[in-house]
Swiss-Prot record:
Keywords, ordered alphabetically: Cell inner membrane, Cell membrane, Membrane, Protein transport, Translocation, Transmembrane, Transmembrane helix, Transport
InterPro entries per record: TatA/B/E (IPR003369), TatA/E (IPR006312)
Protein name: Sec-independent protein translocase protein TatA
Topology within the bilayer: Single-pass membrane protein
Location(s) in or outside the cell: Cell inner membrane
Leader sequence segment: none
Length: 77
């Protein structure tokens, strides 16, 4: 038994069919594009951490005010 109940021979047949359908040139370019995308993602993640500015916490403010009761409108029956 191989991966998930699939034998090595079945995996090789699937790989052969994929190569025959897409061709080696297209698979090579697809792998290259995928690798470039992963490198770009990692680079942007590293740059995001390095360039992240320090976040300043807003300072609390105290407001001096007096509470007063607001008149409520008369209820209509």
């Amino acid at each position: 038994m191989g991966f998930g109940g699939i034998s090595i021979w079945q995996l090789l047949i699937i790989l052969l069919i994929v190569v025959m359908l897409f061709g080696t040139k297209r698979l090579k370019s697809l792998g290259s594009d995928l690798g470039d995308a992963i490198k770009g993602f990692r680079k942007s993640m590293d740059n995001g951490e390095a360039e992240k500015p320090a976040v300043e916490e807003p300072k609390g403010q105290t407001i001096d005010a007096q509470a007063r009761k607001v008149e409520e409108p008369a209820k209509k029956d």
